[in-house]
UniProtKB/Swiss-Prot annotation:
Residues at the catalytic site: 1079 (proton acceptor)
Extracellular topology ranges: 23-876
Designated name of the protein: LRR receptor-like serine/threonine-protein kinase GSO2
Transmembrane regions: 877-897
Glycosylation site residues: 62, 77, 117, 157, 214, 229, 299, 336, 370, 394, 407, 455, 538, 554, 559, 566, 709, 780, 823
Entry membrane topology: Single-pass type I membrane protein
Organs and tissues of expression: Mostly expressed in siliques, seeds, developing embryos and seedlings, detected in flower buds, but not in roots, leaves or stems.
GO MF annotations in UniProt: ATP binding; protein serine kinase activity; protein serine/threonine kinase activity
């Protein structure tokens, strides 16, 4: 018994020893786990999720996330525990580890390379959704037993390791949403067991390797949102098990391979947002299991195969934003009852919506927007009772909206805007109880708004702007508790604003402007505390504002202008978040509230045309973002507060027609952006402060109707950008400075009713843009009328009356074709008026005792009454001599006539030509025939144009007229007749310059092919290649008297803009010496037969004005064109590359907006640049912003619209006031090229939910 006890004791001792011998391995795992925990950082404020990982609890197999097999650790699953810190390299010491999952934490740092030590055991490694960084270790390629590798959604970079091709057992590889670059390894073709490959949302590039076709087990392949390019490999057709293929939003090109029709298992195919072209392969319609097909945002062409409508498994068909053609067939959904979503917007579909659309009974979403569909909306469409989203906007649909719409009880979003629908909005919309968005704007709907709209209790947005709706706004709208946006502008609504709208507490936008509403604003509007935008301008609303509006503390933009409100505006001052505030043209009274100064981000403040009294609040100085201040036509008094000088972003100040007093503040001269200063009709005194003459950006300066004294200083010539100057009705004295001639952009000059003296400076003739008026009347000017006034080519009104001018009236003034109003009355003028002045009334010349001739009384031909009269004999002799002289003169005229015609005939027949082989001159050609089929002869040109008959004229400008000449050899050329009086062929400098220009060749420059001269006055010809499609000006601004061309599409306009910039860049950088164009404008941008841009008339400014003649007409002729001239040219009279860039910027604006820079809308207050700049600052999506884009460009894609705004941003950079702030032509060209290359954008994201 004792022996047995001893043996039992020895057994337990040995067993204990055996356990003790195993402890070192277990202790190592325990230590490794603790090291791993220590690499994680625990937030002391959060619960320690790994609190059981401690040495006091040695049974680690029971620890959180630890899985053991026997006593060996085979799994670590710490997913989603919120761990931070890094992954310890010690993790590589778990020799038997099969599964690692540390996903969905916040771990940082690199992936440990020591993981490669687990090559014999590890089967799954999941590290996705962390913050891991650095390259993916190539050592992971040694984990040959790995079946699942998920590293996506980290901050990894670098390339995909080639060694991953060694993971031959891999079934899942997920690397999405990192920053991986480089190529997809071709060695992936070795992964024959791979079932899932997810590479999307990286920066991978290059083609898909053909070897991917070897991965025959692949069921899901997603590589969307990368930079992959090239063509799609036909080898993809070997993936017979593939169910999901997502390659969207890359740069794949070429055609869709028809071999994709071999993917017999495919259910989801997404190629959105590439550059694929050609036809949609018909074989895709053979994919019997296909449920989702997205080919949108490509360049696919052709018709939609009818077989698509017979694919009975297809649920989602997305073909939007392609260049497809044709119409919807009557066979639509003939064998498809599964189709749920159909996106065909922007596919150039035409024709009518077929009645058979009702076959698509499962449709939930139908998008046919942005096409050219016509006809009526078929009643059968409203049988699609499952519809939740119906988009028919931006088409040419007509007719009425059927009452059958009541069937669509599941409808949530309904857009019909930009069509030609008419009639009443049916009351049956009240059955659409789930409707959330309803856009009917810009149609022709009429009649009253149906009261039943109040039944659509889920409505969030109503936009019916721009129709012909009449009657009152139904009070039932007040039942729409979820309504956030109500837009009814530009209708014919009448009556009161319903008080029930105050129940719509979620409302953020109310726009009821441009109607005929009356009554007052309901006090219930004080409950709309979420309201941000409140527009009710151009109505007949009246009364005091309700005090409850003080509760609207989130208002950012209001416009109450052009109504009949009165009382105080204090109720509007509860918000301190205003961006724009406009109550112009009402009857508001009292003091301007100080609280307006709390809106420091307020950009535009308009209080004009009211009855405000008191002083301008000093608190306005706190509005740091203020750019426009209009308080004109009120009854304000006192001085302009000095605090306004703190508003350094002010561009417009209008304080006209008040009772403001004191001197004009000197601090106005320190507002660097000020472009408009209007202080007219106030009580200002003192002299003109010299500080305001440092405002080099100012465009409008109106100081008239005050009591200013002193003289006009010489510094007035510093106002280089000034368009309009009005100093009339003051007490200014002294001479008019000659520096006035430096204001070359001046459009209007009014200095009447002062006490100015001295002579009118001859420099006034330098104001070549002066157009609206030159008014110097009611002063004390002396001396003669300067003849230079007659050189003002655009002047429409000239008033020099009530002065002390003497001498004769220059006859050239009577020849001014632009002059419509002339007043020279009440001066001391004398002499006989030339017959040109007979077109004005006598009132224009009265009060000048020594002046005679039509329209005044005839001049007295008899001499003085005291002069002795002639004898009869003397009269006979004088008569005889006069008769003989007249006969002799007549004979001389006849002789000269025949001689001149004879000489002219000889000159034309034997004219010189740069190309003529039978020239009467021995002169060699100026340069070789640049592109002409054969030598061009003078006689051929004369014959082709009937001696330059006006019938063949295709253009004219400052440098001369242009004729189209179709030569006998079938070639068509353009011939420019230069307005010149000398034979330029004999001028060596001219020859040298023309020869240089003739060697210039660029894709976007018009080729100069040669020069001809007849040695006759006015018959010097430059020969150019012919541009078959005229100029950009012709296309953009054709009127009813001009043959209307097709509309230039956006893609074409963008190419024209880029071509123009590249042409200018070539002139500036690649010509030696560089060429400054000096007259870039839309009429000089010519289009060839392919509508490709070519800049013409380059170099003419130099060769016709630079060195060869001092002819004034020519010098001004080639200095630029009105509306395109850079502001610095006014004072420097020097054209530079940067002035070319400015002109190019104006043309870019013209291309996008379709507007001329000289349109009537651009007056003395706002030129084209300022208009674009102002409107571009409005919120994205606003209607004002949309009007920047030419209305001819209907239905731009979002990516095209964005590109248009980008071009305008570039144009604004090009038209900066200071030349040094403008980009170079090379930079501008690069900017436009970037816009052109990045114009493609994705349409919709159609992705499957996949593991990362």
């Amino acid at each position: 018994m004792q022996q047995n006890s001893v043996l039992l004791a020895l057994f337990f001792l040995c067993f204990s020893s055996g356990l003790g011998s195993g402890q070192p391995g277990q202790r190592d795992d325990l230590q490794t786990l603790l090291e791993l925990k220590n690499s994680f950082i625990t937030n002391p404020k959060e619960e320690d999720v790994l609190r059981d990982w401690n040495s006091g609890s040695p049974s680690y197999c029971n620890w959180t996330g630890v899985t053991c097999g026997g006593r060996e650790i085979i799994g670590l699953n710490l997913s989603g525990l919120g761990l931070t810190g890094s992954i310890s390299p010690s993790i590589g010491r778990f020799n038997n580890l099969i599964h690692i999952d540390l996903s969905s934490n916040r771990l940082v740092g690199p992936i440990p390379t020591t993981l490669s030590n687990l090559s014999s055991s590890l089967e799954s490694l999941h590290l996705f959704s962390n913050l891991l960084s650095g390259d993916i270790p190539s050592q992971l390629g040694s984990l040959v037993n790995l079946k699942s590798l998920k590293l996506g959604d980290n901050e990894l970079n670098g390339t995909i390791p080639e060694t991953f091709g060694n993971l031959v057992n891999l079934q899942m590889l997920a690397l999405a949403s990192c920053r991986l670059t480089g190529l997809i390894p071709s060695r992936f073709g070795r992964l024959v067991q791979l079932q899932t490959l997810i590479l999307q949302d990286n920066e991978l590039e290059g083609p898909i390797p053909a070897e991917i076709g070897n991965c025959t087990s692949l069921a899901l392949f997603a590589a969307a949102f990368n930079r992959l390019n090239g063509s799609l490999p036909a080898e993809l057709n070997r993936l017979k098990n593939l169910q999901t293929l997502n390659l969207g939003d890359n740069s794949f090109s070429g055609e869709i391979p028809s071999q994709l029709g071999d993917l017999v298992s495919i259910q989801y195919l997404n190629l959105i947002g590439n550059q694929l072209q050609g036809l949609i392969p018909k074989r895709l319609t053979e994919l019997a299991n296909l449920q989702t097909l997205d080919l949108s945002s490509n360049n696919l062409t052709g018709v939609i195969h009818e077989e698509f409508w017979r694919m009975n498994q297809l649920e989602f068909l997305v073909l939007a934003k392609n260049r497809l053609s044709g119409s919807l067939p009557k066979t639509i959904c003939s064998n498809n009852t599964s189709l749920k979503q159909l996106f065909l917007s922007e596919t150039q579909l035409s024709g009518e919506i077929p009645a058979e659309i009702s076959n698509c009974q499962s449709l939930k979403l139908l998008d046919l927007s942005n096409n050219t569909l016509t006809g009526q909306i078929p009643d059968s469409l409203f049988q699609l009772v499952e519809l939740t989203n119906l988009y028919l906007n931006n088409n040419s649909l007509e007719g009425t909206l059927s009452s059958s719409i009541s069937n669509l009880t599941n409808l949530q979003e309904f857009t019909l805007y930009h069509n030609n629908l008419e009639g009443k909005v049916p009351k049956e919309i009240g059955f659409l109880g789930k409707l959330e968005i309803m856009y009917l704007y810009e149609n022709r709907f009429s009649g009253e708004m149906p009261v039943e709209i109040g039944n659509c209790t889920r409505l969030q947005e109503i936009d019916w702007y721009g129709n012909r709706l009449s009657g009152e706004i139904p009070s039932s709208i007040g039942r729409l508790k979820d309504l956030t946006r109500l837009h009814l502008r530009e209708n014919e609504l009448v009556g009161n604003i319903p008080a029930s709208l105050g129940n719509c507490h979620q409302m953020t936008v109310i726009d009821l402007a441009d109607n005929q509403l009356s009554g007052s604003i309901p006090s219930s509007f004080g409950f709309l505390t979420a309201l941000e935008l409140f527009m009710i301008y151009n109505n007949s609303l009246q009364g005091n504002l309700p005090d409850s509006l003080i509760n609207l503390k989130n208002l950012t933009r209001i416009n109450f202008s052009s109504n009949k409100f009165n009382g105080s505006i204090s109720p509007l001052c509860g918000s301190s978040s205003y961006l724009s505030f406009d109550v112009t043209e009402n009857g508001f009274e009292g003091d301007i509230p100080l609280e307006l100064g709390k809106s420091t981000n307020l950009d535009r403040l308009r209080l004009g045309k009211n009855q405000f009294t008191g002083r301008i609040p000093r608190t306005f100085g706190k509005i740091s973002e203020l750019s426009l201040l209009d308080i004109s036509r009120n009854s304000l008094s006192g001085i302009i507060p000095v605090e306004l000088g703190l508003c350094k972003k002010l561009t417009h100040i209008d304080l006209n027609n008040n009772y403001l007093s004191g001197v004009i503040p000197t601090w106005l001269g320190k507002l660097p952006l000020l472009g408009e200063l209007k202080l007219s009709s106030n009580k200002f005194v003192g002299s003109l402060p010299t500080e305001i003459f440092s405002l080099t950006n100012i465009l409008t300066l109106f100081l008239d109707g005050n009591s200013l004294n002193g003289s006009i200083p010489q510094e007035i010539g510093n106002l280089q950008a000034l368009n309009a100057l009005n100093l009339e009705e003051n007490q200014l004295s002294g001479p008019l400075p000659s520096t006035i001639g430096k204001l070359s952009k001046l459009f209007e000059l009014r200095l009447s009713r002062n006490a100015l003296t001295g002579e009118i400076p001859v420099e006034i003739g330098q104001l070549q843009d002066l157009q609206s008026a030159l008014d110097l009347s009611y002063n004390n000017f002396t001396g003669r009328i300067p003849s230079t006034i007659s050189t003002l080519p655009k002047l429409e009104s000239l008033d020099l009356s009530h002065n002390q001018l003497v001498g004769e009236v220059p006859g050239q003034i009577g020849d001014m074709k632009s002059l419509g109003y002339l007043n020279l009355s009440y001066n001391n003028l004398e002499g006989k008026l030339k017959k040109q002045f007979s077109r004005w009334q006598a009132d224009a010349f009265v009060g000048n005792a020594g002046l005679c001739g039509s329209p005044l009384s005839h001049c007295n031909r008899a001499g003085s009454k005291n002069q002795r009269s002639l004898s009869p004999k003397t009269v006979v002799i004088i008569s005889a001599i006069s008769s003989l002289a007249a006969i002799a003169l007549m004979v001389l005229v006849i002789i000269l006539f025949f001689k001149q015609n004879h000489d002219l005939f000889k000159k034309v027949r034997g004219g010189n030509s740069a190309f003529s082989s039978n020239s009467s001159s021995s002169q060699a050609p100026l340069f070789s025939n640049g592109g002409a089929k054969s030598d061009i002869k003078w006689d051929d040109i004369m014959e082709a144009t009937h001696y330059l008959n006006e019938e063949f004229m295709i253009g004219s400008g400052g440098s001369g007229k242009v004729y189209k000449a179709e030569l006998k050899n079938g070639e068509t050329i353009a011939v420019k007749k230069i307005l010149w009086k000398d034979d330029l062929m004999s001028n060596k400098s001219f020859n040298r310059e023309v020869k240089t220009l003739g060697t210039i060749r660029h894709r976007h420059l018009v080729k100069l092919m040669g020069y001809c001269s007849s040695k006759a006055d006015g018959l010097n010809l430059l020969i150019y290649e012919y541009m078959a499609n005229g100029s950009v000006w012709d296309w953009l601004h054709a009127n009813e008297n001009t043959k209307k061309k097709e509309v230039l599409g956006w893609e074409t306009r963008l190419k024209i803009a880029l071509g123009l910039a590249q042409g200018v860049e070539y002139l500036h950088y690649d010509c030696v010496p560089p060429i400054v164009h000096r007259d870039i404008k839309s009429s000089n941008v010519l289009l060839d037969s392919n509508i490709e841009a070519h800049l013409g008339d380059f170099g003419l400014a130099k060769i016709l004005t630079g060195n060869y003649d001092t002819n004034t007409e020519s010098n001004t002729m080639f200095a630029g064109s009105y509306g395109y001239i850079a502001p610095e040219y006014a004072y420097s009279l020097k054209a530079t590359e940067k002035s070319d860039v400015y002109s190019m910027g104006i043309v870019l604006m013209e291309i996008v907006t379709g507007k001329m820079p000289t349109e009537a809308m651009f007056d003395e207050e706002t030129d084209m640049v300022r208009w674009v700049e102002t409107v571009l600052d409005t919120p994205p999506g606003s209607e004002a912003r949309e009007k920047l884009i030419d209305s001819e460009l209907k239905s731009l894609l979002p990516c095209e619209e964005e590109a248009a705004y980008q071009v305008l941003e570039i144009a604004l950079q090009c038209t900066k006031s200071y030349p040094q702030e403008r980009p170079s032509s090379r930079q501008a060209s690069e900017y436009l090229l970037n816009v052109f290359n990045n114009r493609a954008a994705s349409y919709r994201e159609m992705q499957t939910d996949t593991d990362k």
